[in-house]
Each structure stands twice: as structure tokens, then as C-alpha cells.
């Protein structure tokens, strides 16, 4: 789950991490009131969307008076912001962050992620702040400093100092401030079950202060059950509607660009299914794992989600029956196809407990369901069926 910038900064303040004074607003008049509360004679207007690249897309604007402020907020609210990280439809702008301007002398990058290889939290820092860190990693990886956190003892102050001096900084007052910031970010990361935390940029002001000018936070979805405060911050308007619907039924769904819908029980089998579709000359339209308990209700909702994608020209269902009986799965598929009213070909491969009985039920049904003879046959059949339609 992603947070908006204003929500991320709300969390940073709770951990005593310095951020500029700001207010989130939902209409132009409120923006003027926010500016009066913040003070100053110049402000930064920031569209709140779950995407990077807002500045280049016109979603971040510097305004020099309250008339410009009101005009900028009015121009952004209710629009859809298209950046390099969104699709062509963009993301809806429903709120604006009005922020105090900062006297920027230097921009740095600071971030933390979970490294899957070492299974540990890794903190990263770079002198290349204010730019896309992915490009820095691609073109100049040596400019990214890293420290790995031992989970047995946690982040240590000496590791913060390693990053500080690695950035070419020397001022002792700044070192203490930097250490406090990084240690605070570590507490935030671990206590709130984050999967990604980025401060880009972390700025040094003209007076030598360190301020987190922008913040990006991703939370581990699997931990939301114990993060009630963060769970309430979810903005479903920024998420794919199909993925939101899938989450309500505990289905793991990710939309792709192809035209062959996939429904599989098990993430590993789902990935193998997509691979085999590609090898057979087709393109998967989604990743969808119905999990171990492929009940009739969940199968029905999975079909609804798949066919709501207008690009889908055929569906491949690949089920391995371990504890679940394949004949009961077949009954659920037949019932779901009838209930949803699917008019594209459906190829089903069943393997495991009562697979032959399940395949017979599919073959004997009057529905447009093809019972495949094996994994490879299933992929070839659906690619063939979709090719005929195309």
C-alpha cells in the first residue's frame, strides 16, 4: 500500500524527523487559509498522487502570491496527472499539499528497502538527490552508498556516520542531525512495517539545517492487519479498480497488457502458467492467484475481475487439486461461467485429486469450456482459441 506525500510527512513528524510546514487542502479557498497559517510570501503547490515525476508533469508549482496559489490549486484539483510512472489515463488529483518554500543549498537522497537477497533492511544514500534514483543506479551505481542492518542489533549510529561521511559531509552539528534522522527513519520503517521509504530530496538549507523535502512510503500489505492507523490512510482512487476488487476477496491480481486471462491456484504455478502462455505465442492479460481455497464464490469473483478487462479474448484456468477436489472445482467453474455470462473461450487444466472426474464434468457441460489434456496442451489450446477470435 502506498501513502501520499502529506500522509508520509505526517508520519515523519511523529518520529521527530524535520519536514517543511505544510497543509493539505481540498479546495482553492482552503489553500489561501493554509498559506496564511504556514506564513511567508511564497509557497509550493504539490498535487497528491501515487506516482513519481510530478514536477516534470506540472504537478509541482512554485507560487509567489495568494492569487497564483488559488489559481494553481484550482487548475490541478479534479484533473488527472500523467507522469512517466502512470498509464495514459494518469492519476486523479483529489488533494493538494501547500508547503513552505525552503532555501536549498544542496540536495541528497536517502532511502531504505528490504533486500531480498540478504533478507535485511538496507539504507541507501547518494549525493544525487532530487533526481530519479533509478537512473543514478543505472548510470552511476558507485554514487549510491549502502549499509545493511543486522536485525539482531538494529541500525547502529556508526552506520549513520558512515553514510554521512560517505556523502562528503563534515559539519559535526549536521552529523548529529543526520544521525537522528536516519535512526528515526529506521524506527519508522520497522515499527510501521514498511517495504520502501524514500526521502528525495533530503536538503541542506542555506543555514545548514537538514530537512526532508519529499517523502515516499510503501507499506507491506501483509502487515496491514496490525497497522490500523495506516490502513485508514488507503486511497483506493489511486489504485487499479480491478486490484482493489480482488483484495476484497483475498485474490492476488495484477493487470498486464495481454489478452489471455489467467486464473490459477498458487503463485508459483501462476507465474509458470504465464511463462508457458508466452512460450506458446500468447500474451497473459493478468496474474491471478485464487489461493489454496478455490471456492465457488472466489472463482466467480475471479471470473468477474478477469472479464472486466475488455482486452481479454480468452481465459486459461490452471488448477492443481491437492486438498481441494478437482470435481468440486469443475462444478464451481461451470456455475461461475453461467453466472458471470462469459462469452469468450475458457480452457481448463485440472491436475490432482479427482482430476479425471472434473475434466469429464467440464467436457459434458454445455458451456464454452475446453478441458485440456495437460499443462502444455492448455497453453496451446487457449492461444489457438484467441488466435481464431483475433
UniProtKB/Swiss-Prot annotation:
GO terms for cellular component: cytosol; succinate-CoA ligase complex. Coiled coil: none annotated. This is Succinate--CoA ligase [ADP-forming] subunit beta. Pathway: Carbohydrate metabolism; tricarboxylic acid cycle; succinate from succinyl-CoA (ligase route): step 1/1. Substrate binds at residues 265, 322-324. Its cofactor is Mg(2+). HAMAP family: Succ_CoA_beta (MF_00558). It catalyses: succinate + ATP + CoA = succinyl-CoA + ADP + phosphate; GTP + succinate + CoA = succinyl-CoA + GDP + phosphate. The keyword Cell division does not apply. GO terms for molecular function: ATP binding; magnesium ion binding; succinate-CoA ligase (ADP-forming) activity; succinate-CoA ligase (GDP-forming) activity. Mg(2+) binds at residues 200, 214. Binds 1 Mg(2+) ion per subunit. It comes from Coxiella burnetii (strain Dugway 5J108-111).
Amino acid at each position: 500500500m502506498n501513502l501520499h506525500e502529506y500522509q508520509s510527512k505526517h508520519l515523519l513528524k511523529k518520529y521527530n524527523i524535520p519536514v517543511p510546514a505544510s497543509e493539505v487542502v481540498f479546495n482553492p479557498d482552503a489553500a489561501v487559509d493554509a498559506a496564511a497559517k504556514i506564513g511567508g510570501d511564497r509557497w509550493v503547490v504539490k498535487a497528491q498522487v501515487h506516482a513519481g515525476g510530478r514536477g516534470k508533469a506540472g504537478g509541482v508549482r512554485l507560487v509567489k502570491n495568494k492569487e497564483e496559489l488559488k489559481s494553481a490549486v484550482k487548475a490541478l484539483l479534479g484533473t488527472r496527472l500523467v507522469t512517466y510512472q502512470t498509464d495514459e489515463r494518469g492519476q486523479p488529483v483529489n488533494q493538494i499539499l501547500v508547503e513552505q518554500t525552503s532555501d536549498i543549498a544542496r540536495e541528497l537522497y536517502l532511502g531504505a528497502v528490504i533486500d531480498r537477497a540478504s533478507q535485511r533492511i538496507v539504507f541507501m544514500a547518494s549525493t544525487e538527490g532530487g533526481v530519479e534514483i533509478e537512473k543514478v543506479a543505472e548510470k552511476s551505481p558507485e554514487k549510491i552508498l549502502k549499509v545493511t542492518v543486522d536485525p539482531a542489533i538494529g541500525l547502529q549510529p556508526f552506520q549513520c556516520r558512515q553514510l554521512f561521511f560517505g556523502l562528503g559531509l563534515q559539519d559535526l552539528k549536521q552529523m548529529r542531525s543526520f544521525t537522528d534522522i536516519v535512526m528515526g527513519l529506521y524506527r519508522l520503517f520497522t515499527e510501521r512495517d514498511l517495504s520502501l521509504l524514500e526521502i528525495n530530496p533530503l536538503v541542506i538549507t542555506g543555514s545548514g539545517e537538514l530537512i526532508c523535502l519529499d517523502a515516499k512510503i510503501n507499506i507491506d500489505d501483509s502487515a496491514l492487519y496490525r497497522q490500523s492507523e495506516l490502513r485508514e490512510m488507503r486511497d483506493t482512487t489511486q489504485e487499479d479498480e480491478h486490484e482493489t476488487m480482488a483484495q476484497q476477496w483475498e485474490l492476488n491480481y495484477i493487470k498486464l497488457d495481454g489478452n489471455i486471462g489467467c486464473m490459477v491456484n498458487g503463485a508459483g504455478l501462476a507465474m509458470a502458467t504465464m511463462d508457458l502462455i508466452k512460450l506458446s505465442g500468447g500474451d497473459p492479460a493478468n496474474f491471478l492467484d485464487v489461493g489454496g481455497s478455490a471456492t465457488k464464490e472466489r472463482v466467480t469473483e475471479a471470473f468477474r475481475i478477469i472479464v472486466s478487462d475488455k482486452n481479454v479474448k480468452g481465459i486459461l484456468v490452471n488448477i492443481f487439486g491437492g486438498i481441494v477436489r478437482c470435481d468440486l472445482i469443475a462444478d464451481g467453474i461451470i456455475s461461475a461461467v453461467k453466472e458471470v455470462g462469459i462469452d469468450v473461450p475458457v480452457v481448463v487444466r485440472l491436475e490432482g485429486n479427482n482430476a479425471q472426474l472434473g475434466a469429464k464434468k467440464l467436457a459434458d457441460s454445455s458451456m464454452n469450456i475446453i478441458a485440456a489434456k495437460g499443462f502444455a496442451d492448455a497453453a496451446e489450446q487457449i492461444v489457438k482459441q484467441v488466435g481464431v477470435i483475433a
